[in-house]
């Protein structure tokens, strides 16, 4: 069974994390497969837009695989953390625009993965959060930086310090997700947005992505 699946139609590729029995939690194998998948997509000029989601209806991704983490050595833990950071960076920097279709829990590394996407559409059943402090660690896959950029420093501190989960509607209110839709129509709505983006100039969209990402901390003369 492939841990990450892809399906491409009309220039739109849907990438699914395929561990529904583990709430799509990411062990080292899943993380490495995601990196490989997005590196390959970055080279594919036939793909215009990428949708990232999780298999099943319960979870986009519950984040790092805690059971896996409990069984590995300290050196392996460091390597795993670096792999997780590389996952989110690879997703963020892929040339195509990305849409996270959040179909349930997006916690810890799962929330960080969603934040690495350009646009986030959440099912009304989704729950998001950075609960790492509840097990004695800080968010380690770029969550502190990306969350602050998306929702602002005060709200980011609240979410990280408390470790609480928030519902999809609250996530939309604070700007963490762009849209909230019924679970049954999540994939359809993500596809509609992907089609709208794909209908535009590929070069124009990709150059805009680079400009926006690089311009977050730049002045207008850069």
Where are these regions (language model features)?
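Conserved CoA-thioester-binding segment of acyl-CoA-metabolizing enzymes
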Residues: 1-53, 75, 89
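Glycine- (often His-adjacent) and acidic-residue-rich active-site loop
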Residues: 3, 54-90, 106, 136, ...
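CoA-thioester-processing core
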Residues: 87-93, 101, 107-161, 174, ...
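C-terminal long alpha-helix characteristic of the crotonase
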Residues: 121-126, 177-222
